[in-house]
Amino acid sequence: VAKDSFLVGLIGSGIGPSLSPALHEREADRQGLRCVYRLIDIDRLGVPPEAVGDLVRAARDLGFDGLNITHPCKQLVLAHLDELDSQAEALGAVNTVIFDGAGRARGHNTDVTGFAASFARGLPDAPLERIVQLGAGGAGAAAAHAVLTLGAGRVTVVDALAERAAALAGRLNAHFGAGRAGHSTADALPGALSGADGIVHATPTGMAAHPGLPLPAGLLHPGLWVAEVVYRPLETELLATARALGCATLDGGGMAAFQAADAFRLFTGREPDAVRMLADITGAAGAVAAPE
């Protein structure tokens, strides 16, 4: 008998305003399924990010079918899973965990497929020869993997933690071939951006708790496209500034919707309507929260 009820959740920090519960529960309702989606906020629980393994085990023992994982646990969770799919392994980041009938936890990454689908839909003609990416965390790893999968020539990764940028560039080169990725520092951004085709922004800057621009506005120029990972608000200060200069832009709503749709498929085994889920996100565009 096909299962028709599901208990899932989201582990992360500061996730109170997350749209994930509404997205998954609403799509389940429309498909005649029952989905209960719980928020497991490490800040409210008073536990550190390193407790993610304990939380995953507790969710499994309590009968959860699966979990989404968001900042700052996407990389920390790896050590606590029984198995990774090839994409999660290549990325070194997990945003979806599925518990099988035997209680084994398998990690997936729907951020990369979500970003790729959104980019192909929203910036289909964008030149991809040279890309600068800001941010090398879990969402950044997925975005870089996605644009290289879409055919980007080279991605230069910039992160406040230089060693994290270097580590991501190394993993990307190992997966896609030498020379496809590089890493740089913020003080080298002027040179990197002067010859770039586009910017992928994958840091928390622009969210409610982290307002502002992730780079000096003077470094933007009309020849760039700008793709955002932050989805609440859909119109970040970066996108507004870039659009005013004449840049082509892509908000983070598509990545959020398409990654959620891919996670829904993993949780339920049913085919979601991703465009309908994107409309749900667009309809809730007024609030502010983190990329998931």
Question: Which role fits each region the language model picked out?
Answer:
Residues 225, 229-292:
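Adenosine-phosphate binding glycine-rich loop
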Residues 140-141, 235:
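N-terminal Rossmann-fold NAD(P) dinucleotide-binding loop
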Residues 149-154, 245-247:
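Conserved S-adenosyl-L-methionine
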Residues 152-176:
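NAD(P)-binding Rossmann-fold cofactor-contacting core
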Residues 2-124:
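Phosphate/diphosphate ligand-binding glycine-rich loop within oxidoreductases
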Residues 179-250:
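Rossmann-like adenosine-cofactor binding region
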Residues 13, 136-137:
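Glycine-rich Rossmann-fold phosphate-binding loop(s) that bind the pyrophosphate
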